[in-house]
């Protein structure tokens, strides 16, 4: 594969081994062309230099994703790379554009989630980790962009995972081109996917190598329209293994459908007369009946469900299963010799039972079925001869019938699926997915293996041509000089097999057409024809076998059954029998044949299969191919086992080695400039000049090394075979010399260091000795000086002691004398101070006594004068109250309260008695009482009118109560005089009580009589007007504006309804000097009544006016949206919330929907987000479901009597002002909402969520392009040369992080300008940071080049910028920083030094507690240090993670190591409500445009 290289002692090489395929070792001795190698296993071998290959010791432990990037592209390198990746569960690897898939034999659901499909959508091939999704995406993108149909060829031996890979490809293509035309409720892609279970049930079986082996080839054409959506599909099948129906070898199984039907529910089993599968001959030939990993009963239901999806009706399903059951019963029919010679009949009762059952299931005649199995009709020119069959021939006839029935059934299923899916005749492009059997070579190879290997030979030729083409395109792309590369062409093998005439298939067809031909004559014909062919040999000691030298190896075929298996015709008796079936399904499987076909019964399976291959190749040649090679790592079908010899053989059979050989024929080693310089720059350090570019540096280095034949491309260096090894040898030599120099320097340094330490130690010992002697001399001198100092200090102490005693005695005598003198002086001062205090107290007492007398006299005088002034002022105030009706002054309030108490005592006594009498009279004499009331009412009509007008005037001018004159002026004057006198008597403010006693008594009598009459009349009126009063009370409660309430109080007077006559239009002078024209007021009532006839039209116009106003940006008032407040006030006034039917809500929702059509304008969206959330808050606080307040206590009816209302007014007058103020501030009013209002609230909440999502998605879209630039740092090669292909320009890499922050700041400014609620701003930032976390973290896991030390530092610096931003806008960021926990911990792990010292517990509990085992495992295996070349974590940690992953592999909860982007709505209505307050809207002003409209006067 590569040219022989010259190894040196110490070189790491690969040597061939018969057991392990290849072993790695180190060269220990070289003797000419004999090289001794010490293998890593400890074994020493001696090999020739031509049989060893160099090993790349710097290859990453986790392997490379694309094997074309291997330093040495040869068999051991490829095998080692696949094994390294398989050990870390990386089962996919590229070889250029070819994907190699190694079957893991375990569930890896995290690799195939819908989120993973989203990640690969639009990613270029090689950008992310190898995956079938990447191949499917590349095919889809190429089809859409270039308008060329594509094909994906999936191959591999049985059990390699072809079918599963095909399912993944179809899933991804359905994901990309979904939403196609639906048929009967199911889309095309759903039917294509659901066709797999049906085809697997009838076309798959357990083999020695695979529990779910496809026993047919399948080519799925997925058709697309111009826009890239799936418009149709078609499934083509090839070479179903019909012989398996009748012959099954142990431990294999028959087709799955037989076992599923036997495991069907009891009622179905009875319908088809089936039982235990062990009793059926076609199933019990093998001991394997049950599969551990497959539940046949569940698979039966899954298959029926899939049949429903693809459009197979229940009647057709019953017919299908009847045919399957009849085949099982046919297999149990055995034959014995009949009465005639060479005849046969069913052997026993059991056989007759199964014959009868099969006939019933096929709905044909039992006798006809027996005859078709035991007899043949020979037609001659003159007569028809019936020939009987012996038991052996009858068994063959039985098996032939079973095989042809199953084959026809399978063909019908494929045709039905195609019909159900529907093909698009106008399809522009297609993507074909070919799931074909791989190369097969067994101990016994029959006709099936011959056809399978022919298929693989054809596909291998197509594959070789494609690889050669791709190789030449690579050279053209890099603009290098190249010459034609020769590759092994297998055309001679294809000519040997399919050439006409003279090919093996042609000779086989010729043998089949002669009745007397046998497999031995056929073999002899082959021997004679191809005895000199280099690809054809005859095995020794074999009479009828032959061997063909295929591209993947020699295969020996046994010809015993070649002739029988090549014949494809239906026995005439079988055709007639089944065509005559009363079951239309069975009859349609065997339609009547034409006369021409009757004359030519023979049909060759080999020829037909060859024609199918030609048709398939024609389709593939018109498409752009993509290849997936599936590899089975072991024959035990168990995970974690990698058999080198087995895998290597499959790589050869799959053509991967041939592709590598083609690559090696040209330039097998291709290195990017920076990688090449980083690795081999040490050979010529002087070429790494910062001022030179990379291509020039690479050329200088290669010239310096003396290599020839290399090529310098646009981005890569292309090396011939063996040149990489030469460079590595030179590099190893330089590193070896450098190591010697380093060792010499280190030894010199260590010796010098030892000498210096000895010298320092000797110097230190000398210094210690000298110091000891000096300290001894110094100690003697110090002791002598200390003795002298002690003597001196003792003398000084004795002298000081004598002086201190003398001094203390003197001080003591002086202190005693001074104290005696001071005590005498203190006593004198105390006596003087006491005398002064006594004098002071005496003078104060006398002065206070005089002052109190003066103050008492002054207060008495002032009280008398103030009393006089107050009485005079009281008199003036009374006069002013009668003239102006103003009773709000404080003194008048006191007077009125006293008067009210007096009147209430009298009225309650009288009203209690009168009301009891009125109730008794009303119950007994309703009619007589009504006439008496009407007569009395005529007398008091004028008085009642005036009283009610006065009462209404009192309610209008709350809390000011105005006195209204009664119609009887004389009586009113008397009442007024008597009232004044009574007030004077109660308040003790008048002195003339005795003079007015008689007048008061007379006035009280007259008032009492009139009061009885008024109360009786009003009690009846109150009962008759109960409904009207309740309606008026409800309207009065809902009206908040003073003017509207004023008008309604005047216009809705109850006098009209009682008397039946309209009130007299009078003009009166009120006491405040104003005049009221009642006639004009009633004219206004009539106008309003006429206007009420078109209230609906007026409301529609008002709604239009409102919408025209608020659909524009009318701004904010005190930080709250004007539009939302205006809409709420209008809906509240129009009573829309209580309406059972209104169009206002629909109009508003439509207006909001049209306003947010521009999804890209964040400013406009933020404005409407604020308005909708504010309006939602107002509705949340205001609307109460209907019936919620049903249990609440009702308001007592308001008394309508004059004195009752006066008494109520007096009682409530102190609190009226506060109530009015509270009503003015109460912006939000609870309302019992009907269904339209509650629906409007739900729709509004949906729009809040929608607008929130639009703003969030706009920010994500803006940041997504920047995030992709922030995940990977710019790569710098040695010598400071930056890769031009990935250069980020002269700008700092931090500019992308700054752009993200600028985007966040820009949106934050927009949200703040539009007063978006704080909770929504925080949620937007939280979900955005979560999106950043998901994108960065997933990119880290999917891109190996991102898991580096330098990249970790780059991302960490960017995250620091985001953390600084969160600190600056902490109020608005909320918990956003916590959302970056995954990428923070992952990056923190990447930048740790000495990872190999970190234990698993430290990683899980301290460094990365939030990351799962799968995520940690992937980071650890992908990590590589591009700065300091340090190691990743230890193998013990990797093993621990792998063991945990194995335990959790079947856990559905751990199905993905990627993070999902959370696009849900992260808030509730209650959170929005809690973030606002009702008082915030108290100062909001409605829209100015509406305030000028008279219809919206209620907004004032």
Swiss-Prot record:
Sites where the protein binds ATP: 156-163, 210-218
Annotated region (Actin-binding), positions in chain: 496-530, 532-555, 590-613, 613-635
Domain Myosin N-terminal SH3-like residue range list: 8-57
Record GO terms (molecular function): actin filament binding; ATP binding; calmodulin binding; cytoskeletal motor activity
One Gene Ontology biological process: actin filament organization
Primary site of residence: cytoplasm
Any one GO CC term of the record: myosin complex
The keyword Repressor belongs to this UniProt entry's keyword annotation: no
InterPro entries: Dilute_dom, IQ_motif_EF-hand-BS, Kinesin_motor_dom_sf, Myosin_head_motor_dom-like, Myosin_N, Myosin_S1_N, MyosinXI_CBD, MYSc_Myo11
Protein's job: Myosin heavy chain that is required for the cell cycle-regulated transport of various organelles and proteins for their segregation. Functions by binding with its tail domain to receptor proteins on organelles and exerting force with its N-terminal motor domain against actin filaments, thereby transporting its cargo along polarized actin cables.
The protein's assembly and partners: Homodimer.
Name this polypeptide is given: Myosin-8
Organism of origin: Arabidopsis thaliana (Mouse-ear cress)
